Design a protein with these regions (language model features):
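N-terminal secretory signal peptides and thylakoid transit peptides that target proteins
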Residues: 1-18
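N-terminal active-site segment of His-dependent metallophosphoesterases
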Residues: 33-42, 47-48, 93-186, 457-459
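Short, ordered, surface-exposed loop/turn motifs in non-cytosolic proteins
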Residues: 39-42, 46-61, 404
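Short, acidic Ser/Thr/Gly-rich low-complexity loop/linker segments typical of extracellular
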Residues: 61-76
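Extended active-site neighborhood of metal-dependent phosphoesterases/phosphodiesterases
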Residues: 88-107, 182-277, 294-311, 318-357, ...
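Active-site glycine-centered loops adjacent to acidic/histidine catalytic or metal-binding residues
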Residues: 137, 175-176, 204-205, 286, ...
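Binuclear metal-dependent phosphoesterase catalytic core
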Residues: 325-409, 444-478
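Aromatic sugar-binding surface patches on proteins
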Residues: 423-452
Length: 481
């Protein structure tokens, strides 16, 4: 505890003065209105005083390309009171004062016209190679959890960024940045500011104005005040990035469903019309698209592209495949809601690290407080109550391109069984109505990344796990006799 507090003091943070009485509004956001007079939006996208042609600009409804001089001019009746530039490849991601990406301007809805200037700066190093951190579910609710985020998780983010050594690194907060306490956005912002990289933000179900909203349309007011639009796009190198809001508030207490509104689908259809078929698209959302009610319509829009979907929400890792879409459901920064070191499926508290080279993408899951090589957990025979005669492995980021083998006294054995089962450590920490102490409602979850095998009674075992990219992780163990 003293070391953590020393780190916080060093970084100039003070969790003892949480922003419990208010939240810092950056934008002066106005409530959307269903019917209003159109506003003329005109302006320029420029760099070094020179207009940039063919750059997409949008109000969340209309998508228009700048002309040869970088100018744009359109009438907006969008319900989203922002205009944003779909940042083109080769230009820096500027930051707001709170550390988030700056790519938008608020619109004055009472004015008959708005003049907008987007000034972009070229990157210092080509961004066809770039890296990103995906932070799903930091989900801070109180002072203790803020301290955990700032003193344990954030130093890990910083160290990973240092090791990446990539000037084009950026981050994505993949929703549930806080846990209903929206005033803690300021404390979340302290974490991302400390990383010194720009962060794009995704709205999660716990980031919404549930208590004083009657429809989904106005349920992201506070989020918008801090971070801007809740859906948008941008480009890095050869990759087109999309952020969607797939949390639909029903207007009943905290009730929501996974659903993408027609406004977003119509906007996305127009946005993607300017993207060449066959390109790689990375889409970020909070609720896994696999669980979204109208996902088929989204898959149809994405069908011309090679798509990776990055999501969170479930506090466990899953990989889903739908035609040309690979969805990566990430483990939570907060694990099982800051109750201990792991998520409900046994995945360590952590985040995703993605590296892009041209149109190719590689990734790994980074466990907080562990080396990047920490990719599985071994359990001796007799530990798993359902399989008492087996040794078991939890390989949390496993997908079908991974391989697993083991050596018994130097002899290679390749037979392992993948079984839907719970993780023994999760069972120990989470099972029952009194565990975990901080969140007794958190229960161990059945997962599809548990593996089982049966060694001889007396053996020395080496486990060898290889990921999708040929990286091999080895551990030698001596199981019970």
């Amino acid at each position: 505890m003293e070391n953590r507090r020393a780190f916080i003091k060093k970084m100039g943070w003070a969790t003892g003065s949480l922003s419990l009485l208010g939240t810092t509004s950056l934008l002066g956001w106005q409530n959307p209105v269903l019917w209003r007079k159109p506003t003329r939006v005109k302006g320029k996208v420029a760099s070094n005083k020179k207009g940039l042609p063919k750059v997409a600009v949008s109000d969340g409804e209309t998508v228009i390309l700048t002309d040869k001089n970088g100018n744009f001019d359109f009438w907006s009746s969008s319900q989203q009171p922002f205009v944003f530039v779909s940042l083109p490849a080769g230009y820096q991601i500027d930051q707001l004062a709170n550390g988030s990406a700056s790519f938008f301007k608020p619109l004055d809805l009472k004015s008959p016209s708005n003049e907008i200037l987007f000034q972009l700066k070229p990157v210092q190093q080509r961004d066809d190679k770039h890296s990103l951190l995906i932070l799903a579910d930091p989900q801070i609710q109180n002072e203790y959890e803020v301290e955990q985020l700032l003193s344990i998780s954030t130093p890990d983010f910083i160290q990973t960024i240092k090791e990446l050594n990539d000037p084009n690194t950026f981050g994505v907060g993949c929703g549930d940045l806080v846990y209903d306490q929206l005033q803690l956005f300021d404390d979340y912002n302290q974490s991302i500011k400390a990383t010194n990289i720009p962060f794009f933000q995704v709205v999660g179900n716990h980031d919404m104005d549930y208590l004083d909203s009657r429809t989904d349309q106005v349920s992201t007011r506070t989020f918008n005040n801090h971070f801007g639009p809740s859906y948008y796009s941008f480009n890095r190198g050869e990759i087109h990035y999309i952020v969607l809001d797939d949390v639909f508030f029903t207007g009943v207490k905290r009730e929501y469903i996974g659903y993408i509104t027609e406004n977003q689908l119509a906007w996305l259809e127009e946005d993607l019309s300017y993207i060449e078929a066959g390109r790689t698209v990375i889409l970020c959302a909070h609720i896994p698209i696999f669980h979204v009610k109208n996902k088929a319509h989204l898959y149809e829009l994405l069908s011309p592209f090679k798509t990776h979907i990055l999501s969170g929400h479930t506090h466990r890792i899953n990989h889903y495949f739908e035609e040309n879409c690979h969805e990566h459901v990430l483990g939570a920064v907060c694990g099982a809601w800051w109750s201990g070191p792991i998520c409900v499926d046994g995945t360590p508290n952590g985040y995703g690290v993605y590296q892009v080279n041209g149109s190719d993408l590689s990734w790994y899951y980074k466990s907080v407080g562990k080396d990047k090589s920490h990719q599985f957990r071994f359990y001796e025979r007799g530990i798993h109550p359902e399989f008492p005669n087996s040794c078991s492995l939890n390989i949390w980021n496993w997908d079908s391109k991974w391989s697993v083998c083991w050596y018994e006294n130097g002899e290679r054995k390749s037979h392992v069984r993948r079984v839907n089962a719970t993780d023994p450590l999760s069972t120990k920490l989470h099972m029952g109505n009194k565990l975990p102490e901080r969140r007794p409602w958190a229960e161990p979850a059945v997962t599809d990344h548990m593996f089982f095998f049966e060694p001889s009674d007396v053996s020395n075992i080496t486990i060898e796990v290889t990921d999708s990219f040929g990286n091999t992780f080895v551990e030698t163990v001596s199981p019970n006799k």
